[in-house]
UniProtKB/Swiss-Prot annotation:
Keywords: Coiled coil. This is Coiled-coil domain-containing protein 73. It comes from Mus musculus. The keyword Coiled coil applies. Residues 591-600, 742-781, 789-811, 857-869, 948-964, 1003-1013 have a biased composition (Polar residues). It comes from the Eukaryota. Residues 568-600, 719-811, 854-883, 944-978, 1003-1027 are annotated as: Disordered.
Length: 1066
């Protein structure tokens, strides 16, 4: 640069030196500025490069962390897949064992195929209902558009009115301006008049002063005249000339006076005239003041009206904006619902395809079973012949058996019941089903010992729980809310097989356990229960095999039988179970005492492990047991008199098939009413041949965890004279749709449970008696049957007894259809078998709760169908929680409809509790996956939290009615789950289009919250290996909880969390 400067300077030597110096200085300044700019740019680049390097390092670290997380998730996914494969392998082996057992029966699969077809029809009906709901939604949208159009028209009219008001206001302001101008003119005129008055007053004063001076002059003149007259007399002559002159002056003065007087008169007249004008002006001024006041008042009123109108306009504009926002939200919700509807249709189509595939598999299996059935029939006939000879021997040998044999037989029976549950597919045998088919052929067949290998295979998965007699996986009827506190009478494998054949006749019922001739063998534990404990009663029936469908409906009867002295007369149509239920409700309302007598208190303190005390109690009742056995034998020998007059024993009742029509009428009435929940339930099974006496054991059902231990023995410890009081829970405030029948004990002695057995023949469960002390808020839609689960907890109850008494009401449940098919559901919860060796009645399995939310549109919730994955597993969060309501758990069983998880009521609020708690192990040998969290709540506290927002319930029901969330391992997409969770909170979305589901009970909003993560009650459930599966489920839950917490805390990482969630769930 300096060389260039030198060259330029040498080249310009001819220029002046001053000019060259200035140019050089200018160039140097330019050079310095360019250098500074270059340095600054270099600094900026270096800073940017350092920042970029730091960002790149951070991004590399994040990518590495993401890769590590991805690898960890892949490892977890592979481990889960391996575990799932292992579990599926075990399940496949078990299913193969079950299929070998299922090949023994042909009729079941025929009915299974029919049921599948009916389910397909039911799915078609659900599709129709979905289409109807879509059409109703379209109607709603059109109505909303019409409302918006009308609103716009009203807005335009309002704007027009505002414009007119503004015009009126402008006219009024113009008139007001004119009035003001007139007022100003009036003020000016008044001022001028005042000035004129002042001038006139000054003139008047001047004239008065002049008049006064003239008067003085007149006086002086008069005096002078007098003097002049006096002098004139003396000087007439002299002053004659002077007088003439003075007279002339006097006349002139008089003329002046006259002129002045006239002027004064004129002035006075003018003054009076001016005063009158002043008064007129004052009057007009007052009038103008009044007008001005009126105008000002009118202006103030108009201003106030304008302010009000402006405020109204602003409020209307705000309302317009809110309405627009609501319309947008409704449109978005409608779009989301349409998307979810399309997804639901897709899932439904997938289900239809799966059902078709399963139907094909079942048809193939039927073809193979038809071949084996002929061989088995021959073997069966031989066994029947042998049983005829051995039947009466066992009746004679019954007194010789001791309690140890009965315990072993009970163990076998319970295990056979459980194996029968799995052999018959999703048809599960009830714990409380102590119906006895006394057909001689069946007895002989039962007495026939089967091959030891097959029975050992059936009983092997359950040997762990056989010692403590934990038959918790024994099914219970969906309408039966409790188990018998007594031992299930022993059952051989043939009896179980016969139960399977009878179960096929009524595929929608888990047929009661037929303990046909083992009654005699169970003298110590069976017959003592009939007579001494007074809570059992026999049902004598001659119904044929075609009538078994109706007779088996008595499994779900909500018969509360606290006193056994009730001869059942089926000719009566009146409900007789209400006074006793009132008594039980009274006891439950005072559940702090537990019961009215010491046996109840002692019973409430029994834990599931107290088996020895129960057996001792049985031994003390052996004398009464003998009497009960004798009465039972008398009933068998005297079958016809028992049918006519009722059994002589107070614990025996007769059931006449001829009154089925009358009972059908009672059943229809009971379906429309919200009957209370039953404490005892009748399970009867009709023999295929006449002459068979059916010994039906009423089953104790705990009213809730709070009253389960208290009310279980309301009939157990009472004497035979404590006659028929039925614990109907008297609701404090029943809804108009609910009927809580309240009858006195005297009325019940007359009616005596006839109607319930009658309804049982017509295959309708009368009702589960429900303790509605504010715990159930049943909202019944039109013609629908609501299910009201009860979740209350007792402070006295230990946590090991995780009893869920969310018992659906039978008369209102969707499981009861016109054909009278009923499903028995697993009651895997409560294990109060410490009473006499069998599970007491309070347990409610997840399958029972599962169907509590099914709509009547579902085809009576067949337990047989393997395609029952369409059972609704709906989240219904009644409270806004961070944990979303779409957490799903994969069932192990191929029949998830029976076994799948139901998140009851407040599933979402209770999930965090589930994540924090450990699973409750009811015994040392049994792993219970269902976990119940029942807070220790006093009934007053529960009553306070009963009433919920019916609109929120209806929205929850609407959500439930539309969405069928499947318990597949795949789960649903996150968007669907979020949409289903959001629809619950939609306050503005109309709910009329949705078919009214049974609402989740408002008890679910109370302190008792139930979460059941229940896998299939397969034999794997009783195996020690189930701990691994349980720990796996808990690990999944913990992972999901962590991911959800990340989702709530770190919003930018939501995509990552969603992918991780989907990977884990898949």
């Amino acid at each position: 640069m300096e060389d260039s400067f030198n060259t330029t300077s040498s080249a310009s030597t001819f220029t002046l030196q001053s000019s060259s110096e200035t140019m050089v200085s200018i160039q140097l300044l330019d050079f310095r500025t360019s250098l500074l700019e270059a340095l600054e740019e270099l600094r900026m680049r270096r800073k940017a490069e350092t920042q970029y390097e730091e960002q790149i390092a951070k991004i590399i670290l994040e990518t590495q962390e993401l890769k590590w997380q991805k690898e960890a998730l892949q490892n977890q996914k592979e481990a889960l897949i391996k575990q799932h494969k292992e579990a599926m392998g075990v399940l496949k082996n078990q299913l193969q064992m079950k299929m070998y057992a299922l090949e023994e029966e042909k009729g079941k699969y025929k009915l299974a195929t029919e049921i599948k077809e009916k389910e397909i029809e039911g799915l078609k009906e659900t599709l129709k209902t979905l289409q109807v709901s879509q059409y109703s939604l379209q109607k709603k949208v059109s109505e909303m558009e019409q409302k918006a159009h009308l609103y716009h028209l009203a807005k335009e009219d309002y704007h027009k009115q505002l414009n007119e008001i503004e015009k009126y206001y402008a006219a009024i302001t113009n008139q007001f301006g004119l009035v003001r101008e007139n007022h100003v003119k009036l003020e000016q005129n008044v001022q001028e008049a005042i000035q004129l008055n002042k001038r006139l007053s000054t003139l008047n004063e001047k004239q008065e002063s002049e008049i006064h001076s003239l008067k003085k002059e007149l006086k002086k003149a008069a005096s002078e005249l007098i003097k002049s007259k006096v002098t004139c007399q003396h000087k007439m002559e002299e002053e004659s000339i002077d007088l003439i002159i003075k007279e002339q002056k006097y006349e002139e003065l008089q003329e002046r006076l006259n002129m002045e007087l006239e002027v004064n008169k004129k002035i006075n007249e003018e003054i009076t005239h001016i005063q009158e004008e002043k008064q007129d002006i004052i009057i007009s001024f007052q009038h103008m003041q009044q007008l001005l006041q009126q105008e000002t008042q009118a202006n103030t009123e108009i201003d106030a009206e304008l302010k009000v109108l402006r405020e109204n306009n602003q409020t209307l504009e705000r309302d317009n904006e809110l309405q627009r926002e609501k319309v947008k939200e409704n449109e978005e919700k409608f779009l989301s619902l349409e998307k979810e509807h399309e997804r639901a249709l897709g899932t439904w189509k997938k289900h239809v395809e799966e059902l078709s595939g399963e139907m094909n598999v079942i048809k193939n299996e039927l073809s193979s079973l038809r071949e084996t059935h002929a061989k088995l029939q021959e073997h069966y006939n031989k066994l029947c012949e042998q049983k005829k000879t051995e039947e009466y021997k066992k009746f004679q040998n019954v007194p010789e058996l001791n309690n140890e044999n009965s315990d072993e037989l009970t163990r076998k029976k319970s295990e056979n019941i459980i194996t029968q549950k799995y052999n018959s597919g999703p048809e599960i045998w009830g714990k409380n089903t102590k119906s006895f088919c006394l057909d001689t052929e069946y007895r002989e067949e039962e007495k026939k010992d089967l091959p030891v290998g097959k029975t050992a295979e059936d009983l092997q998965p359950f040997e762990i729980s056989a010692k403590s007699e934990i038959n918790t996986m024994v099914s219970q009827d969906r309408n039966q809310s409790g188990m018998s506190p007594h031992r299930v009478l022993c059952l051989d494998k043939d009896a179980t097989d016969q139960e399977q054949t009878s179960d096929v006749t009524d595929s929608r019922k888990s047929v009661t356990v037929e303990v046909k001739d083992k009654l005699c063998l169970e003298k110590a534990s069976g017959c003592s229960e009939f007579k001494s404990l007074n809570n059992f009663f026999l049902v004598v029936d001659e119904s044929l095999e075609t009538e078994m469908v109706r007779l088996e409906g008595t499994e779900g009867l909500g018969l509360l039988h606290s006193g056994g002295d009730i001869p059942l007369d089926t000719r009566s149509n009146k409900a007789s179970s209400n006074g006793m239920s009132n008594e039980m409700a009274h006891k439950r309302n005072y559940n702090t005492d537990g019961s009215e007598s010491n046996p109840f208190k002692q019973q409430s303190k029994l834990l599931p492990a107290d088996l020895e005390n129960a057996t001792e109690k049985e031994i003390t009742n052996q004398d009464q047991t003998k009497a009960g056995l004798d009465s039972f034998l008398d009933i068998k020998l005297n079958l016809d008199p028992c049918k006519k007059h009722g059994l002589q024993d107070s614990s025996h009742v007769t059931l006449d098939v001829k009154h089925q029509k009358i009972k059908q009428m009672v059943r229809e009435e009971s379906q429309c009413s919200t009957e209370p929940r039953s404490c005892y339930q009748l399970a009867s099974k009709a023999p295929q041949k006449p002459g068979g006496t059916i010994a039906c054991a009423a089953v104790v059902s705990p009213l809730g965890p709070s009253a389960s231990s208290d009310n279980k023995l309301t009939a157990l410890k009472k004497s035979e004279n404590s006659i028929n009081t039925l614990p109907t829970a008297a609701k404090p405030a029943p809804s108009p749709a609910e009927r809580t029948t309240r009858t006195n004990t005297n009325d019940i002695q007359n009616s005596s449970l006839r109607n319930h057995l009658g309804a049982s023949e017509s295959s309708v469960s009368v009702s589960d008696f429900q303790v509605n002390q504010g715990d159930s808020h049943t909202s019944q839609a039109k013609g629908l049957k609501t299910v009201v689960p009860l979740t209350t907890s007792s402070e006295k109850q230990p946590p090991s007894e995780s009893q869920i008494t969310e018992t659906p009401k039978s008369g209102l449940s969707s499981l009861v259809d016109v054909t009278g098919r009923q499903c028995m559901w697993l009651n895997n919860r409560d294990k109060t078998e410490a009473l006499n060796g069998i599970l007491s009645g309070g347990t409610c399995h997840e399958g029972q709760l599962e169907e509590a939310h099914l709509s009547p549109a579902t085809p009576s919730a067949d337990s047989v169908s393997t395609s029952a994955r369409s059972a609704f597993d709906l989240p219904s969060p009644d409270k806004p929680e961070k944990t979303p309501g779409y957490i799903k758990f994969v069932p192990l069983s191929p029949w998830p409809k029976v076994n799948q998880t139901k998140t009851v009521g407040t599933a979402t609020p209770s999930i965090p509790l589930f994540l924090k708690e450990k699973t409750v192990d009811l015994s040392g040998s049994r792993v219970i996956t269902p976990v119940t969290f029942c807070k220790n709540v006093v009934l007053d506290d529960t009553r306070k939290n009963i009433e919920s927002d019916p609109t929120s319930n209806s929205r929850a029901a609407d959500t439930m009615s539309n969405w069928s969330i499947h318990l597949d391992p795949k789960g649903q997409p996150r968007e669907e789950r979020n949409a289903t969770a959001q629809t619950v909170y939609d306050s503005s979305f109309p709910t009329e289009h949705v078919k009214a589901e049974p609402l989740i009970s408002t008890v679910q909003q109370s302190h008792s919250q139930t979460v059941k993560v229940t896998d299939s009650p397969d034999p794997l459930t009783f195996s020690p290996g189930n701990n691994d599966w349980q720990s796996l489920v808990m690990n999944r839950l913990t992972e999901i909880e962590k991911l959800l917490s990340l989702e709530s805390d770190n919003q930018p990482k939501r995509r990552k969390v969603e992918e991780m969630l989907d990977n884990i769930i898949d």
